[in-house]
Amino acid sequence: MSNAYKEAGVDIEAGYEAVNRMKRHVERTARKGVLGGLGGFGGNFDLSTLGLKEPVLVSGTDGVGTKLMIAFMANKHDTIGQDAVAMCVNDIVVQGAEPLYFLDYLACGKAVPEKIEAIVKGVADGCEIAGCALIGGETAEMPGMYEEDEYDLAGFSVGAVEKKDLLTGEHIQAGDVLIGLPSSGLHSNGFSLVRKVLLQDAGLTLQTECATLGKTLGEELLTPTKIYVKPLLACLKQGLLAGAAHITGGGFYENIPRMLPKGVGIHIDYGSWPIPPIFSLIQEKGGLSEQDLFHTFNMGIGMVLAVPEDKHQQALATLEANGEDAYIIGRVTPTEGTVIGGIGA
């Protein structure tokens, strides 16, 4: 084989080795409906195996944002893939769909097989938690576009739901109970602000031991985004949900209204759930208001469910049976707008 391409910065052999290394991780995500294996021109999935009468496909794509820079700094790459999966499948399940399969896109400055394997391992871990198959992807070595130790990671997921069961939020009404599911921390949003406040301005490092966190700052920041697929599917199967919102960039103020029909709003009871200490640390070091925090971060709640009053106890029991802590954090109100009671300006 000619060395011309390698001399230009693209190592084909390293790419082949990376693919071979990732195969075992891909294989453990296999599920019913997947046709064929890794290496084809596209991934195939047989929808007829789901037994849906009027299937609706629900798709989502997302990335990990500048949380990747924390992974670069820590030289730890085996969990960032779960973040990519979580950001996609959580967006799908809030629409009532079961995630079926996932594809990843990884662009890097230099193909290092061990690093690529670690990244894909994290993707496969996320797929296993979500119950979806990793059926394909693209790994692109792009010298000159990225530095040798840099990469970007994005994901694409597709799910399916019976048309009649599509969760649109149109049936949410005043009086519905808002149930919050705890986050695992920052998840994958707000990291540009986090880096400025904690690393740049406060002078902390990823090795800083934070007593309030009980771990190093790096360990806290790289905690993977939580995947909520299985507990939500359990609630959906019983018809318990009127709506659901994945709390990502924009926090409570931007994400909860996305599930609401016109004519209603929400009132959140601040203090009705425990807020992880990472948010207090960011507030203290950055001099941020509570309004700033709720406009930017998930504040310890990664998923908000709207549940009819007469079903909320059953929903809480179902969530608990599926390993989820859950908190009643507020109500749907008859007046449009988002009110978080008890926070300062």
UniProtKB/Swiss-Prot annotation:
Transmembrane annotation, as ranges: none
Pathway assignment: Purine metabolism; IMP biosynthesis via de novo pathway; 5-amino-1-(5-phospho-D-ribosyl)imidazole from N(2)-formyl-N(1)-(5-phospho-D-ribosyl)glycinamide: step 2/2
SUPFAM superfamilies: PurM C-terminal domain-like (SSF56042), PurM N-terminal domain-like (SSF55326)
InterPro entries xref list: PurM-like_C_dom, PurM-like_C_sf, PurM-like_N, PurM-like_N_sf, PurM_cligase
Catalytic function, reaction form: 2-formamido-N(1)-(5-O-phospho-beta-D-ribosyl)acetamidine + ATP = 5-amino-1-(5-phospho-beta-D-ribosyl)imidazole + ADP + phosphate + H(+)
EC number(s) per entry: 6.3.3.1
Localization per record: Cytoplasm
Example GO biological process: adenine biosynthetic process
GO cellular component labels: cytosol
Keywords: ATP-binding, Cytoplasm, Ligase, Nucleotide-binding, Purine biosynthesis
Molecular function terms from GO: ATP binding; phosphoribosylamine-glycine ligase activity; phosphoribosylformylglycinamidine cyclo-ligase activity
Principal subcellular localisation of the protein: cytoplasm
Protein family per UniProt: Belongs to the AIR synthase family.
PANTHER family registered for this protein in UniProt: TRIFUNCTIONAL PURINE BIOSYNTHETIC PROTEIN ADENOSINE-3 (PTHR10520:SF12), TRIFUNCTIONAL PURINE BIOSYNTHETIC PROTEIN ADENOSINE-3-RELATED (PTHR10520)
Protein name (database record): Phosphoribosylformylglycinamidine cyclo-ligase
Species of provenance: Shouchella clausii (strain KSM-K16)
Phylogenetic placement of the source organism: Bacteria, Bacillati, Bacillota, Bacilli, Bacillales
